[in-house]
Amino acid sequence: MISSCPARQLWVIPATLILACTLLRGQTIIQSFSGVSLTDTTKLGTDTTPPDTMGAAGPNHFVEFINGAFAIYTKSGVRLSLISDILFWENAGISPATISAGLTDTRVVYDVGSHRWFASEITLDTTGAQVLVARSDTSDPTGTWKALHFTGNTGTRSPDFDTLGVDSTGVYIGIDNFSISGTFTGVSFFSIPKADLVANPPSLANMTRFDNLDNMIYGSELQGVNNPDPGTGHGVIIAIDNKQFQLVDRTTINGSGAAGATLGTTVDINNTYDAYPNPAAQPGGQTVDTGDDRFSSFVRQVGNNIFMANTILQGSKDAVHWMVLSEPNNTLLGEGIISDTTHDYFYPSIAANHSGGILLAFNRSGSTSSDGNISIYAAVGTVTSTGVAMGSPFLVRQGTIGNFHFAGDSAPYRWGDCSATMVDPTDDNLFWTIQEIPIAPTSWGTLVTLISLATNRPSLTITRSASNLNLSWPASTDPAYVLQSAPSVAPSATWATVPNSATIVINQNVLTVPLAAGPSYYRLKK
């Protein structure tokens, strides 16, 4: 808190004097807004559970793509559009006949290198099921998209749980394979040159297929690593080992920018924590499904480090397990768990920025009334060249429902199957996370949250436009700071709060106020 605003920056414009100052701030929740809910998908005629919670942040928008729905929001949380996933694919050029069997397992990412959005989903055909992949025509997701599709499996197998990764040269999709009877039969992986997908028209002509890979070698639920940085010369696949616990499988993708990509020798990486999780408890006695120990959300690389998180069993309770891998030498820089003896922690997602900040977000539940309601938590960490530290979990949104269940389902009730956390592409200090949360005993919702890890001093900037002043300050600024104005900076001056109707534009809070007749001073104060 400050008692006066030091004159760090000074502008003089006709009839008005404006003073701007900078203030220290810490890591904080900037905002949260409600995403798509079961009520929304019911209205669209595509209601299902679980939603497969998924989203991504771009320069000016947040996109939510879940089972049954595709929604676009401003960064201030205003919903601009909501359509079914069926209509999304049809608008992008996929025929109704191709997707008539139904759809599942949505993924969406924003790629800073190409300034495009990428999305994937799979059809529910018993045989010949299709993998759908789309990209936006520009960085604006409200504009047009173009999509392609290909058969997911050779033979009489059906795909499940597609994954999506993008790096400087490739777009990667992984799938699990199942027989018609539902038996798991292995995994497949597809490497698509990114330049081919962003071309007009997009093409799959140079896609490399790795069909029916041995999951005992490559692992399960193959994750092509998302890497926003310029090329390392290769891509990376990360997966949980399927032959024994406490192993992560890493495979290099060579030549992903062209036809004929190849896979390197898989390396097994030892880790400390691993066990299949149990269903998560609720105060009302019902349980929810927490899946298994797979990497259900994106695996991300920043610089030389790869960040991953999964759900495991620690003692008798589910825990969030995080790992940071040094990509060049396949060694763990650090790993740890978020756990305690009275709560279950599940469906994590992780992201990191270039200054070493990490955000890990997840659900928490337990058997104790109120405290055990399914809620959203997060933890902040730091990575350096010598190791990784992760802080204690903090509350993002307290749940209000103690007995979530779903009509037509049975305990453990379906939940997840994933969440998503990412760095804002316009500000390395801003992190977004989208998580599932109950909104009624028989209805799920989703919540989008913006969290700042900034440690720098934000600046208040003022410009004049005709008879108005445009005030802007970083979106990463702690919302506890309020904008105030006064006619002078004298000790006796009365500072009045300026009503904050700011909107987020790219990575700035922007507010327009009328130009005053006399001197005006502005400050941020907490």
Located regions from the model:
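Short, structurally constrained coil/turn elements
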Residues: 20, 141, 489-491
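N-terminal secretory signal peptides that target proteins for export/translocation
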Residues: 1-10
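C-terminal PAP-associated
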Residues: 26-456
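Hydrophobic alpha-helix-in-membranes signature
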Residues: 13, 227-229, 473, 513
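Bacterial N-terminal signal peptides
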Residues: 11-25
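Short, composition-biased motifs enriched in small/polar/acidic residues
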Residues: 456-526
